[in-house]
Amino acid sequence: MRTTFMAKATDVERKWLLIDAEGKTLGRLSSEVASLLRGKHKPTFTPHVDCGDHVILINVEKIVLTGNKLDKKVYYRHSGHPGGLKQTVARDLLANKPERMLELAIKGMLPKGSLGRQMFNKLHVYAGDTHKQEAQQPEVYELRG
């Protein structure tokens, strides 16, 4: 009888992946990056262990939203004080903080809890085409779709 393989946190080998987000759709890119951060592309995937790779996203300001989402999609945040609800349209968020838009989309696709926060820390998002992780020698990753 065979037993199910369960990876240990010490045995996980992590790679650094570089993804160019130019011209990619927000949701399709986010779901694939979330899968890479979880480690679901590896045959040794274990749900209760952080098996994912580090992901570097560049050219995030050139991301695409389909339909009328640039004008209709609204992002909310709250200061914690009464009447402190702020809202921002996707067009303004993309112009001012394009990294935040992708971070919010990916964070919502990761598990909620300490393991999800640990996975989210392996995400590195940059608006331009330069990044600070040249020393890690990331390999270019081509998306499936």
From Swiss-Prot:
One of its GO terms (molecular function) is structural constituent of ribosome. SUPFAM superfamilies: Ribosomal protein L13 (SSF52161). Gene3D superfamilies: Ribosomal protein L13. Keywords: Ribonucleoprotein, Ribosomal protein. CDD domains: Ribosomal_L13 (cd00392). One of its GO terms (biological process) is translation. It comes from the Bacteria. The keyword Ribonucleoprotein applies. Belongs to the universal ribosomal protein uL13 family. Part of the 50S ribosomal subunit. This is Large ribosomal subunit protein uL13. It comes from Exiguobacterium sibiricum (strain DSM 17290 / CCUG 55495 / CIP 109462 / JCM 13490 / 255-15). The lineage of its organism: Bacteria, Bacillati, Bacillota, Bacilli, Bacillales.
